[in-house]
């Protein structure tokens, strides 16, 4: 285990780009772990994946901490998203492997014009607050539809845009994303492929609490009772995988069972979908690599989780 050390905090875009270029000139692989802060063990596992990403070359690890307003709709929880920058720095220092933290005050041009919808007709917290200052958006047209994209129409547009901006600023060789946000991971993979970013995207496995709850910064908002009820998500996913591996591969039956379980435990289901792992195309029968994706509300907290299944293995 590496000895604890303080990472350098960088807030300026030009300084961040220059830092990365110096590290690359030194023969290092630059790896980035994008986060919105309020770090937990799941985030630290992404850092471990970044540290292991370059076996041949030394690696310089950048963690970004930036709560991106363009991926939140005005009705969503931007204002209450948890934050503890000092605590985050302590956690990052404890790993001993993080070289820099990119924590910009803002990454968007702020306009003073009228409020209005940008391309696609969707309005985010950014547009509501800043008018038409920012006008350029990155969209992954098909993969952003359905699942989280159905109930959060600005989300993936905001994610793809901010990640593109971070990639252009940091110029990493490697970027690590958690597979808990499965659709987001696939959207980023497709964006990198389609736009010819010379970046390796690593998907890191879900990290769970001892009782199975997927780690999330939003878990802090759950009451004790809500948290106990929320365990029905991971338990229903494990049951579904167990059943599928035993031959229960009818997707309609599987989805209905998960919805029933979550509803009976007090959850409000946003969606349950079974899709091909790479294309995210819904399937009716499990006969290859699929992922079951779930989003549900417990109290005022929206939680997502998923489980990969391959009945061929």
Curated annotation (Swiss-Prot):
It is an enzyme of class 6 (ligase). It catalyses: (R)-pantoate + beta-alanine + ATP = (R)-pantothenate + AMP + diphosphate + H(+). One of its GO terms (cellular component) is cytosol. The active site is at residue 43. Beta-alanine binds at residue 71. It is found in: Cytoplasm, Cytosol. Pathway: Cofactor biosynthesis; (R)-pantothenate biosynthesis; (R)-pantothenate from (R)-pantoate and beta-alanine: step 1/1. Keywords: ATP-binding, Cytoplasm, Ligase, Nucleotide-binding, Pantothenate biosynthesis. It comes from the Eukaryota. Transmembrane segments: none annotated. Its main location: cytoplasm. (R)-pantoate binds at residues 71, 184. GO terms for biological process: pantothenate biosynthetic process. This is Pantoate--beta-alanine ligase. It comes from Oryza sativa subsp. japonica. The lineage of its organism: Eukaryota, Viridiplantae, Streptophyta, Embryophyta, Tracheophyta.
